[in-house]
């Protein structure tokens, strides 16, 4: 009887362990891809990334793609850029900063091993640079000008440089490229960009972080009739 009870207990424990393993596997798969099958990961496309920037569960799916090593590097970079482009929800830029129960780009990058993170960030930088160089969209006749997407990319560049004392960006060359991109962006349409209320990090905050290099090109803009002369003078 004792051996029978032992065998029965062993079978029960094995069954319980298998059940728990299956549950854990399902939870892991759900977190990793936000859908019901692991095989979907290899089929994730840029179109999926674009769509997820606008859906309710999209932020979780983008984080899952960015952080999981089963996805190709380029689609992980695309997920990161999708989080940069994601519009504010409820007045919060959850793509970059996340929210209480949902990590954003910065927290997701922190969770990735440094060697892999460096590869992802180094591929993000040229795309951030390109978007920050684009001209603001023009207003159509009788309509307000569309939102300038370069603000989102500027915010991401600044966040990468400064989050957790700058540890997300490891290479000095990449750091310098981001700094130059931020200076160029800030010196373009300076007065207008100074007043944009939707940006996460104001132009003045960015320039103060960049120091003397950031404001070196402001003095030539101090001409009679220029907008925001007092603000420029304060920065210099």
PLM region descriptions:
Residues 2-42:
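Sec-dependent bacterial lipoprotein signal peptides
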Residues 42-236:
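Extended repeat-based scaffolds of very large eukaryotic assembly and lipid-transport proteins
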